């Protein structure tokens, strides 16, 4: 009898072990599938819908005018060692890395501009912390040699005006370069250190304004007929005949975001809050200087973390680019630009929404709970009967 009982127990034990293994396999498959989709494949699914805008091209000498494909993003705010929790770093930096690498692979831009505040603590970080942040940035925003990556100075990178120092600016420029003027495929870009546009005559501010006046002179020379002025005596070749695209961190002066609209504009309760000059936006005087000196055909800026489109006096349009990070908004995005020397077209590309990903994780957690409860038959009888009927129907 003892042998018979032992045999029956052993027979009952094997099906139980098989059921546990089946449950473990189901849970593993669901968890891995959800992780792969939410942390990897969703970026391809969402960014696959983005396309380069069409721009009118003119023929010169029997050849079509070249089109430059440029990406513009802003305010990545990589967290530092002081305010950055490790889980916050891991989550938000992985999101930006996957979004950027997917965009490079799918869209293949020729140049990428980041409009300031790439770091969150550059204004007070030590040299070692700065080196660590730079290393993380270079890993996240790695790119092939045929893609150019240009970065504009932001207030979190070197500090607000009264925190800014020559040392911090040199530290930034040592990594990201100091060029203010860039010409690609006949398109002129002017990258401004808008933190230095305080207008109080400080040494850094005076040097920045002097450099911008020199750029203004070069742009004016490009519009003159060769042989008709002193510009011909310049040792450097002339710039392409093209009104520049102005890139900076602070927006040009505007009273508020009251006239901004769209799903990624500032929340309605914040749009009528007046902006503070030299903190939220550039001062009126600094804005007028930039528009007068450079006469841009397009201005792109960051800083506010929200989208806005403004038409400035003289007809210069400005586009404020929203933050690229989930840390600053639920629906981050970037701008795609197709540019020629005479024309341009812009479109916006949204990244996966953070609440969508969190909802998917919540739904997956609920499904896992149901699997576990069904396995141990802890569901109320109506749910259990319904589950068994579904399984029976699926087998047929």
Swiss-Prot record:
<feature type="binding site">
    <location>
        <position position="249"/>
    </location>
    <ligand>
        <name>a divalent metal cation 2</name>
    </ligand>
</feature>
<feature type="binding site">
    <location>
        <position position="305"/>
    </location>
    <ligand>
        <name>a divalent metal cation 2</name>
    </ligand>
</feature>
<keyword id="KW-0472">Membrane</keyword>
<dbReference type="GO" id="GO:0005654">
    <property type="term" value="C:nucleoplasm"/>
</dbReference>
<keyword id="KW-0812">Transmembrane</keyword>
<feature type="binding site">
    <location>
        <position position="155"/>
    </location>
    <ligand>
        <name>a divalent metal cation 1</name>
    </ligand>
</feature>
<dbReference type="InterPro" id="IPR039541">
    <property type="entry name" value="MPP_MPPE1"/>
</dbReference>
<dbReference type="Pfam" id="PF00149">
    <property type="entry name" value="Metallophos"/>
</dbReference>
<dbReference type="GO" id="GO:0030145">
    <property type="term" value="F:manganese ion binding"/>
</dbReference>
<feature type="binding site">
    <location>
        <position position="303"/>
    </location>
    <ligand>
        <name>a divalent metal cation 1</name>
    </ligand>
</feature>
<feature type="transmembrane region" description="Helical">
    <location>
        <begin position="28"/>
        <end position="48"/>
    </location>
</feature>
<keyword id="KW-0931">ER-Golgi transport</keyword>
<feature type="binding site">
    <location>
        <position position="75"/>
    </location>
    <ligand>
        <name>a divalent metal cation 2</name>
    </ligand>
</feature>
<feature type="binding site">
    <location>
        <position position="117"/>
    </location>
    <ligand>
        <name>a divalent metal cation 2</name>
    </ligand>
</feature>
<dbReference type="GO" id="GO:0005794">
    <property type="term" value="C:Golgi apparatus"/>
</dbReference>
<keyword id="KW-0813">Transport</keyword>
<keyword id="KW-0464">Manganese</keyword>
<feature type="binding site">
    <location>
        <position position="117"/>
    </location>
    <ligand>
        <name>a divalent metal cation 1</name>
    </ligand>
</feature>
<dbReference type="GO" id="GO:0033116">
    <property type="term" value="C:endoplasmic reticulum-Golgi intermediate compartment membrane"/>
</dbReference>
<dbReference type="GO" id="GO:0070971">
    <property type="term" value="C:endoplasmic reticulum exit site"/>
</dbReference>
<dbReference type="InterPro" id="IPR033308">
    <property type="entry name" value="PGAP5/Cdc1/Ted1"/>
</dbReference>
<dbReference type="GO" id="GO:0006506">
    <property type="term" value="P:GPI anchor biosynthetic process"/>
</dbReference>
<comment type="similarity">
    <text>Belongs to the metallophosphoesterase superfamily. MPPE1 family.</text>
</comment>
<keyword id="KW-0337">GPI-anchor biosynthesis</keyword>
<dbReference type="GO" id="GO:0006888">
    <property type="term" value="P:endoplasmic reticulum to Golgi vesicle-mediated transport"/>
</dbReference>
<protein>
    <recommendedName>
        <fullName>Metallophosphoesterase 1</fullName>
        <ecNumber>3.1.-.-</ecNumber>
    </recommendedName>
</protein>
<comment type="subunit">
    <text>Interacts with GPI-anchor proteins (via the GPI portion). Interacts with TMED10.</text>
</comment>
<keyword id="KW-1133">Transmembrane helix</keyword>
<dbReference type="InterPro" id="IPR029052">
    <property type="entry name" value="Metallo-depent_PP-like"/>
</dbReference>
<keyword id="KW-0378">Hydrolase</keyword>
<feature type="transmembrane region" description="Helical">
    <location>
        <begin position="356"/>
        <end position="376"/>
    </location>
</feature>
<feature type="binding site">
    <location>
        <position position="249"/>
    </location>
    <ligand>
        <name>a divalent metal cation 1</name>
    </ligand>
</feature>
<dbReference type="GO" id="GO:0062050">
    <property type="term" value="F:GPI-mannose ethanolamine phosphate phosphodiesterase activity"/>
</dbReference>
<dbReference type="InterPro" id="IPR004843">
    <property type="entry name" value="Calcineurin-like_PHP_ApaH"/>
</dbReference>
<keyword id="KW-0479">Metal-binding</keyword>
<comment type="function">
    <text>Metallophosphoesterase that catalyzes the removal of a side-chain ethanolamine-phosphate (EtNP) from the second mannose of the GPI-anchor protein intermediate. Participates in the glycan remodeling steps of GPI-anchor maturation to allow an efficient transport of GPI-anchor proteins from the endoplasmic reticulum to the Golgi.</text>
</comment>
């Amino acid at each position: 009898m003892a042998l018979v009982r032992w045999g029956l127990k052993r027979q009952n034990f094997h099906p139980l072990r098989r059921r546990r293994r089946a449950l473990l396999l189901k849970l593993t498959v669901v968890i891995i599938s959800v992780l792969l989709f939410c942390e990897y494949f969703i970026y391809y699914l969402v960014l696959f819908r983005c396309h380069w805008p069409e721009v009118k091209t003119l023929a010169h000498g029997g050849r079509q005018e070249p089109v430059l494909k440029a990406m513009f993003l802003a305010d990545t705010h990589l967290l530092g060692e002081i305010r950055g929790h490790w889980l916050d770093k891991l989550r938000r930096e992985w999101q930006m890395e996957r979004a950027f690498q997917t965009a490079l692979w799918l869209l293949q831009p020729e140049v990428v501009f980041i409009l300031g505040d790439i770091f969150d603590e550059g204004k007070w970080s030590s040299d070692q912390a700065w080196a660590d942040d730079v290393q993380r940035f270079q890993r996240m925003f790695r790119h092939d040699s045929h893609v150019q990556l240009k970065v504009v100075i932001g207030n979190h990178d070197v500090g607000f005006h009264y925190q800014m120092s020559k040392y911090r600016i040199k530290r930034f420029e040592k990594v990201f370069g100091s060029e203010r003027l860039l010409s690609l495929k006949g398109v002129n870009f002017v990258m401004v250190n808008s933190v230095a546009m305080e207008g109080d005559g400080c040494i850094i501010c005076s040097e920045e304004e002097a450099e911008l006046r020199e750029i203004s002179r070069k742009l004016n020379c490009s519009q003159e007929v060769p042989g008709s002025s002193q510009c011909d005596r310049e040792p450097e070749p002339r710039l392409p005949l093209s009104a520049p695209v102005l890139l900076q961190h602070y927006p040009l002066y505007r009273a508020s975001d009251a006239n901004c609209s769209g799903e990624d504009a500032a929340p309605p309760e914040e749009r009528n809050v007046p902006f503070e000059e030299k903190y939220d936006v550039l001062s009126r005087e600094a804005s007028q200087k930039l528009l007068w000196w450079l006469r841009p055909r397009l201005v792109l800026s960051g800083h506010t973390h929200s989208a806005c489109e403004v038409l400035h006096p003289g007809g210069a349009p400005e586009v404020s680019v929203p933050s690229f990070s989930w840390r600053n908004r639920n629906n981050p995005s970037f701008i795609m630009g197709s540019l020629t020397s005479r024309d341009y077209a812009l479109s916006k590309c949204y990244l996966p929404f953070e609440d969508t990903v969190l909802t998917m994780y919540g739904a997956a957690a609920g499904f896992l709970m149901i699997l576990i409860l069904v396995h141990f038959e802890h569901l109320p009888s109506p749910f259990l009967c319904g589950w068994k009927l579904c399984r029976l129907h699926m087998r047929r």
